[in-house]
Amino acid sequence: MKIDFIVCPESIEYKLESKHSVTVREARQVLLNNPRIRFVEKGYTKGNDLYGAFGQTLAGRYLSVFFVYKPEMATAIIISARNMSKKERKSYGKK
């Protein structure tokens, strides 16, 4: 999956910082730092499928970033980001 552009709506940016203590910068780092990506669910309309990216920030923080991928524009639209759960972290370690 090729990601050329990363978009984070302002309302999502606020939620990431207030609810999950994750900055957009950290979420971008995960998406650009060779994450493990998995399909989460099919979108209601074609081209709006949800994916999860699991990886590390440059500071070493393990995050799960959820995004909608627009293949025609190679764009990831960030929907949510949070610390990896213990189960996700264990699975990520087996990469």
Language-model features: where?
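Ribonuclease/tRNase effector modules and their secretory precursors
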Residues: 1-95
